[in-house]
């Protein structure tokens, strides 16, 4: 029926333990820089990857989850990189064992209605990253077995957004 088709399309695809494979790479640190705007938000990320020591085979691609993102730029160790865009993410082709990935994307939280990733509600920016919402913010290894230390910077027009509240400890505040 039409209703069951809609419901099945909204349901996430199940992931079974028997299909689990460890990630070829892990993440040491993640730095996020949000430039919040009325019509768009630019998210810049700097992610430090390293080879997972339990994975011994060589890797010719690394899949990063990403949905509803407009890719502006992508670099590995400051250089252009080969990649392949897909609807649900991108493949980095021939990634080094250890590298720094820099990605810049454009997102539109002002027009999101699914309440995942970064979205606006009553004029406030909000995030919902569990279970798979983070992939709507930037390209990332969005899986529960890959952990990282995060540093986040939020930039916004003070007149439009006088209060910026983030989960974590305040490191620095400026009035620019």
For each predicted feature, which ranges?
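Acidic/His-enriched low-complexity segments
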Residues: 2-176
């Amino acid at each position: 029926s039409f209703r069951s088709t809609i419901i099945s399309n909204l349901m996430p695809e199940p992931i079974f333990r028997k299909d689990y494979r460890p990630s070829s790479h892990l993440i040491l640190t993640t730095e996020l820089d949000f430039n919040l705007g009325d019509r768009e938000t630019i998210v810049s990320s700097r992610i430090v990857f390293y080879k997972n020591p339990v994975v011994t085979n060589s890797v010719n691609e690394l899949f990063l989850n990403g949905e509803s993102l407009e890719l502006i730029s992508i670099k590995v160790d400051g250089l252009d990189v080969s990649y392949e865009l897909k609807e649900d993410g991108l493949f980095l082709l021939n990634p080094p064992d250890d590298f720094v990935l820099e990605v810049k994307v454009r997102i539109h939280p002002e027009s999101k209605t699914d309440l995942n990733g970064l979205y606006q509600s009553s004029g406030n920016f909000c995030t919902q990253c569990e279970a798979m919402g983070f992939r709507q913010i930037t390209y990332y290894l969005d899986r529960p077995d890959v952990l990282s230390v995060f540093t986040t910077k939020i930039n916004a027009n003070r007149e439009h957004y006088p209060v910026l509240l983030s989960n974590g400890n305040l490191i620095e505040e400026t009035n620019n």
